[in-house]
């Protein structure tokens, strides 16, 4: 199968490479031509074609039963502009996929607008960060059933597969989507994929914050505000490591935390000023709309706000985790 990919950053480029490794062909475009050239060079030989412009990409994809274009750009105006341009370049039967972190209500609107032109729209919440090339991507997507079936070869190639994760008892019973244990899921109509990914990221905020606070408490057990007899000098890297081995809180986030603390007990390479990319805010907005209490996620989001006005070790833990799973660097 052939697909166009727009935006070849940390995830978009790796998505292109992974698809070619699984026998698919890609037409790739990035606003920086050097990036496009680099990604083509990383792809399997003969399976990647560069496109200079969006119009060039649309032309190169002509002849396919349905032209499919995956947009992997930052949420907001840049993605909105790209989708609008594609809406004018593609036609009836073609498919636009937004694999970024778009606000789900924008997906609902775009889907309706594009449907008037006969263009299908799929929103894919994509998790996996810089590790997705080798591990695969966990994907939650929304769109019509027919479109989901057509792009299944693309999604199944990107997904991690069942791997060595134990199967959940009862999964063979009727009513369970077999794609879920392969690492990708058709959640429902347009907007539902990004909605589920939005909540996923809200949960991520809470989990990260719990680790950050816990390590901060342990580090501060040697604080001068305590009487000397009450102090413990604890090794953060060793504690993170032992927790990885069979504890209830073992997880990928803990793995990344252990790596960071093994490299540097103080995490002084991080300022502790923690960004938020929008999904946490949208999750809280959804909770308010639904009258659902979400105190943990709300506190985690507000802590990120606080981090930008005063630094402490907890925020350095968060920065280290974000760098570990997504290659996110702190804003200077």
UniProtKB/Swiss-Prot annotation:
It comes from the Bacteria. InterPro entries: 6-PGluconate_DH-like_C_sf (IPR008927), 6DGDH_YqeC (IPR004849), 6PGD_dom2 (IPR013328), 6PGDH_C (IPR006114), 6PGDH_NADP-bd (IPR006115), NAD(P)-bd_dom_sf (IPR036291), Pgluconate_DH (IPR006183). GO terms for molecular function: NADP binding; phosphogluconate dehydrogenase (decarboxylating) activity. Its EC number is 1.1.1.343. The keyword Metal-binding does not apply. The keyword Oxidoreductase applies. GO terms for biological process: D-gluconate metabolic process; organic acid catabolic process; pentose-phosphate shunt. It catalyses: 6-phospho-D-gluconate + NAD(+) = D-ribulose 5-phosphate + CO2 + NADH. Substrate binds at residues 101, 127, 129, 200-201, 205. It is an enzyme of class 1 (oxidoreductase). Keywords: Gluconate utilization, NAD, Oxidoreductase. Pathway: Carbohydrate degradation; pentose phosphate pathway. NAD(+) binds at residues 7-12, 30-32, 101. The active site is at 197 (proton acceptor), 204 (proton donor). Catalyzes the oxidative decarboxylation of 6-phosphogluconate to ribulose 5-phosphate and CO(2), with concomitant reduction of NAD to NADH. Homotetramer. Belongs to the 6-phosphogluconate dehydrogenase family. This is 6-phosphogluconate dehydrogenase, NAD(+)-dependent, decarboxylating. It comes from Gluconobacter oxydans (strain 621H). The lineage of its organism: Bacteria, Pseudomonadati, Pseudomonadota, Alphaproteobacteria, Acetobacterales.
